[in-house]
Amino acid sequence: MERRWPLGLGLVLLLCAPLPPGARAKEVTLMDTSKAQGELGWLLDPPKDGWSEQQQILNGTPLYMYQDCPMQGRRDTDHWLRSNWIYRGEEASRVHVELQFTVRDCKSFPGGAGPLGCKETFNLLYMESDQDVGIQLRRPLFQKVTTVAADQSFTIRDLVSGSVKLNVERCSLGRLTRRGLYLAFHNPGACVALVSVRVFYQRCPETLNGLAQFPDTLPGPAGLVEVAGTCLPHARASPRPSGAPRMHCSPDGEWLVPVGRCHCEPGYEEGGSGEACVACPSGSYRMDMDTPHCLTCPQQSTAESEGATICTCESGHYRAPGEGPQVACTGPPSAPRNLSFSASGTQLSLRWEPPADTGGRQDVRYSVRCSQCQGTAQDGGPCQPCGVGVHFSPGARGLTTPAVHVNGLEPYANYTFNVEAQNGVSGLGSSGHASTSVSISMGHAESLSGLSLRLVKKEPRQLELTWAGSRPRSPGANLTYELHVLNQDEERYQMVLEPRVLLTELQPDTTYIVRVRMLTPLGPGPFSPDHEFRTSPPVSRGLTGGEIVAVIFGLLLGAALLLGILVFRSRRAQRQRQQRQRDRATDVDREDKLWLKPYVDLQAYEDPAQGALDFTRELDPAWLMVDTVIGEGEFGEVYRGTLRLPSQDCKTVAIKTLKDTSPGGQWWNFLREATIMGQFSHPHILHLEGVVTKRKPIMIITEFMENGALDAFLREREDQLVPGQLVAMLQGIASGMNYLSNHNYVHRDLAARNILVNQNLCCKVSDFGLTRLLDDFDGTYETQGGKIPIRWTAPEAIAHRIFTTASDVWSFGIVMWEVLSFGDKPYGEMSNQEVMKSIEDGYRLPPPVDCPAPLYELMKNCWAYDRARRPHFQKLQAHLEQLLANPHSLRTIANFDPRMTLRLPSLSGSDGIPYRTVSEWLESIRMKRYILHFHSAGLDTMECVLELTAEDLTQMGITLPGHQKRILCSIQGFKD
């Protein structure tokens, strides 16, 4: 009894100790001896003197346990205790065992040092089995789990004081495969009490995380099990790369490593607990899942229902394009206030105050519209928009300051100015722009004190006079002129509508004083200064002898001049016939060759504007309507506009303007181009409609070319035009240049940028700012300075600044290259110095990709270093016409000669290869489209490409024969 009593007493004491708190995992119990309702009936081996079952009463409930305290002094203690068969089922592959036990301290036995063979540990073992094996112990089949040692052992003193501690041991059994198992406890000599044994497995419980629900999950035998969550109602998976919500169930039944999460849909936000998505209340919105919470509707917007994703603007308020739902709604501004003006001559200043209501925006802008009316505002006469001569400073649109300066107005005319206030939401509603207007009647523009009357013709009883009006009259201006004519005997007044008058019924050989003034609905203007004119003396009835001699001499002189003209025209016709026979000209310009006026420099005129009118047609600005800016020229902006000549239909034109800030000497340079164009008439030369020189801004009006400059047109339509279309365009350019050369003009700036294309793909030569007249067909023009377009200019023109028709032929070859390369820049990124050196060394541009061989041969002929060997434009035109008539000849692709490839001096490869990288090489031969093909094939160095064959290129996906030929020819050039 000595070994039993102390242990039993200890059990009664320790059962009163609290158990440790449960784990977070969900535990499913398979066996728990502490809940047993009767004796456990476990297998004891040996049946006696070993483990024994004990019963204790706790709070009226029996508690069954096992204890073993062997006789001390024996070293061969071998006591076994086996549990009943524990059914595991098919679910859990990993179970846990929890032991509650006490162990007596060996030193607490009588003797102090502990009895012989006393131990303080015992062993836990298990055996798997698909069924109950009965009372057969089968010790060899058990596998050891662990050696169980007590953290706290007790002594007799602990029993007496009631401080015995209960030990708890947990261990796991993994990767179980049978339907059940047995537990066994092997005691090698410890005094131990097995208070309870619990066998269980763990599950990850159902849970919520990140607005996603995760189900109850069984862990795996080892490692983590990934489980996908399900988003709660009105929630969606995050669009971020983390993706849908996921968590990982650990073998211990705990949720670990959350990845991703759900977010509430637009119109919903997380509830206070973060476990549900609730609708945004009315008056608030949530536009996207990136917004953390519902937001209050911005000003002037509302959301009447719950769950709104956007707040709608209230009536009369809007959001400007590009403004998001988070921006407050705003309205258009009210009209400008207190519009006033001050006038000085034909200039006007308008001022106004900002609108009283800006609509809640800061981007208020103003627009000013000008109308010229035949009557006053009270008369209600018809009005039309002001012409191009009216200018607004700083502008008429998008004004940020409430003021504008207007000039270019006409005297004695009625104007109405309308000022509109606009902001970012103007025009979004049904209401129009808020505006205010003012009507103004202009007075006298200026004094006529500087007006000069000029005598046109005089006779004994008539005087024809003309004068320059102070400003051109516009339609509806109702201007008339009143002349005051007097001499010593009479005085008369006469009114005319034009600045020209024929005074009749005058006295012969009499002096008359004449002055003029303008009459308008506002009243008469001031008179001009007095001018004296004298009529011719009366003609006598008979001729004197001297007069008869003069008449005879005049007749003889006229006959001689007529005879000289006839001889000159006969010889000229003979020369023209001989020239046509030599050149076999076919162009339309040969059919009607005109004798053109020789080029006259405007500086030779005392009045250069009058010189320009000798070669051009002066247009009335009232016939023009400016639409939009289409470009910026050397002298000013270029506009698209409309020209309506009297009794003719409207036509679209291009309007080049001379800006007011140009230096004083620039305007005659501007008009010089018009004087040259005015002498040309050819379907492939840009047609001049006329000029405006009598009012600022000075303008040149030409026909409008819908497709703009040739180089930009080709870049936009790369691979859309077939070779036949390109040849037709080149034939047109050659025809125009042939016309110029036959009239002894050298262009000096022939390039694709100076060729214009209309809607029918007809090309016309333009930009004659550098054009000069040669003395004869083979003449030269030498310039003293100025910039030269190196990439398009012949070498002799670069070196000696001497320009001929042959230098234009060289430029035409560059234009051909531009056309066949669809607008590429000649010579790429080479500097001008590198271009000049390469040309002097004999290098020429390589053929463009898929360039027909006959066209490249023409290019090379144009680039002959000796200018005498270059073909004339007539032969170029004829050759291009032959190619158009025989399109099959365009199928042959030009060979790529690597000896003509332009090499940059800065490139220095190895082994005779002038390129550092494969991409540089492919770009130089215009095969850069295949850079990825070479990279994918692993050909990243120039040494790798030297052994390529046609079969290799086919396998790489380069199948076009012309492209294969170009690449292989270049490689062969490296080898040579």
Swiss-Prot record:
Gene that this sequence comes from: EPHA1
Organism's domain of life? Eukaryota
Q: Which GO terms describe its biological process?
A: angiogenesis; cell surface receptor protein tyrosine kinase signaling pathway; negative regulation of cell migration; positive regulation of angiogenesis; positive regulation of cell migration; positive regulation of cell-matrix adhesion; positive regulation of stress fiber assembly; substrate adhesion-dependent cell spreading
What subunit structure does UniProt give? Answer: Homodimer. Forms a signaling complex with LCK; PTK2B/PYK2 and PI3-kinase upon activation by EFNA1; regulates T-lymphocytes migration. Interacts (via SAM domain) with ILK (via ANK repeats); stimulated by EFNA1 but independent of the kinase activity of EPHA1. Interacts (kinase activity-dependent) with PTK2/FAK1.
Extent of the signal sequence: 1-25
Fibronectin type-III domain location:
332-445, 447-538
Q: What is its main location?
A: membrane
PTM annotation (Phosphotyrosine): residues: Y599, Y605, Y781, Y930
The record's GO molecular-function terms, alphabetically, read: ATP binding; fibronectin binding; protein kinase activity; protein kinase binding; transmembrane receptor protein tyrosine kinase activity; transmembrane-ephrin receptor activity
Keyword annotations for this protein, in alphabetical order, are:
Angiogenesis, ATP-binding, Cell adhesion, Cell membrane, Glycoprotein, Kinase, Membrane, Nucleotide-binding, Phosphoprotein, Receptor, Repeat, Signal, Transferase, Transmembrane, Transmembrane helix, Tyrosine-protein kinase, Ubl conjugation
Q: How is it modified after translation?
A: Phosphorylated. Autophosphorylation is stimulated by its ligand EFNA1.
Name this polypeptide is given? Ephrin type-A receptor 1
